[in-house]
Amino acid sequence: MKYLLKHAHLIIDGNREFLDGALAIDGERISDVFVHSNKIKDIADKYEEIDLKGQLVMPGFFDTHTHGIDRMGFDNAGLEQMDKISYEFALDGTTSFLASLSYDLSPEDFDEQLTTLEDYHGKYARFEGIHMEGPFLSKKHLGVGNPDLFLMPDLQMVEDFMKKTSRLKQMTIAYELEGAKEVGKYLHDHDVRVMCGHSDAVYEDLDENVDGFTHLFNAMRPLHHRDITLVNCAFMNRWYCELIADGNHVDRNVLKLVINNIDKDKIILVTDSSTARNLEDGEYEFMSKKCTKKGTKFITHDGHYAGSVVSINDEMKVLRELGVKYTDLLLYSSLNAFRFYGLDKQFGTLEKGKYADLVIMDDELNIKDIYVRGNFIHV
């Protein structure tokens, strides 16, 4: 199909926006971008014209840390469920995602799911690969985990995991644990991003193979004026930082601190969403724990957050209420993550030749329509 989206408020990249622009789609790709809708006369008869009447157009969102949605989780999803997850993500504007395998899995469970997901690519939202949140995590920062499944880093185990899959893109590790540096180097050498999280690490524990921090502030030591914790390190602007911006995992005033002081190119919005996302309020089981969903909170019976129940789009609304610009929201929700994984030449901005993964929204960021690989999905 060939579409011409006109009278659109185009958020192009982290610096540019066109208030009355136009964007042409030919097949899977963006075929042209116009700074003003009055520039389209020469090509208008070749496309199906769609008047957006000033609505926002942004690149599709990339959620690099999510565990599932609507009772379906990556820890045990088969290919049919993966298609359903892919569709529900697309409806929320998440056109690309990593499947996060949780620390509730044994090594044997990891093996099985790595094998299951090896040849999956995403029927709707794109499946870009796997994030292993475990098993090499600190028992001091369990989250909702089972301490028996938190293991010491084991290079042979990682090598065995890598024999099962070519799709591993990221692993979360507690970098202070003995053997972590050897695992980190191996992963780095195999183009897998190394994230430090569920960790008691401080600055001295890190090395050149660490790429960033998993869900900043959560499951790590807090900011300190003498100990250089991972939170302190985040403000050095040397590492990428996952940020859950639901207003619960990180207080809104602390979110302001982050966006005002951490380099805008280093922040990656993630949901860390649970299988209770998109469900009604009530009681659910997640990662072998009984949890309660109430509004935007999902909490175990002993008071711990068990992941979120929001979308990237929901988090963008929170940040917009804090005064974040549309161009910065593009960075946080899309481009930074694509750049982190080396995919930014194909995704993450509205530029000629890139994939037409688009989210159409009103000025309050309510999603109206989606395009995935140039295919229209009505919300």
Specify the residue positions occupied by each region the protein language model found.
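Active-site core of metal-dependent hydrolases
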Residues: 159, 163-280
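Conserved, mostly hydrophobic/aromatic
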Residues: 54, 132, 187, 213, ...
